[in-house]
Amino acid sequence: RVDGFFIEFNGVSAAPATLEKVHKALKEFKKSGKWIAAYGHEGINQADYYLASVADSIYLNPVGSVDLHGLGGMTPYMKKLLDKVGVEMQIVRVGTFKSAVEPYMLDDMSEANRLQTEHYLGIIWNEMRDCIAKDRKLQSAALNTLCDSVVVTFKADRLLKEKLVDKLVYRNQMEDILRARTKVDKDEDLNFVS
């Protein structure tokens, strides 16, 4: 018997397609009428939050934070290093948007590669942002502005104010909430599956 779904986040690391599948699976589970609760003890990363947004309630440790800032990427460029050690790459490249060899032949990202990278990351971020906004009943544009304003991470009190989390609780308080939802006595252990 499953009463609900409790997700405790600790740094989900998965490809965007995998995250999307899990997000959709959580939405399907939610259609059963059973509850979903999400909890972040320390820092919640962007992937964690994307999945947590499906939950009926998002709980966060009062000293926790969320890293929610959009998507980006970084490519190491090695041309100067290769020149310094005397390695000459033999590169065959056809086409403007063929950028796999750029790290060996350039010192910085080409404009064509920047354009295509911004385009595909933009598509992924827009989907994540729109899902989070819909799940949390926020405006996509407002969420985007909020994410653009973050320098490091959002602290717990700001997240509560912006309605990105529902309640700030410590782990033992989270267990009390789960006991109440599952009708488990205080002296009994909760049954978790991981």
Indicate residue ranges for each PLM-predicted region.
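PDZ peptide-recognition modules
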Residues: S149, A156-L159, L168
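Short acidic-hydrophobic, aromatic-tinged amphipathic segments that line or gate anion-handling sites
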Residues: Y59-L60, V165-R171
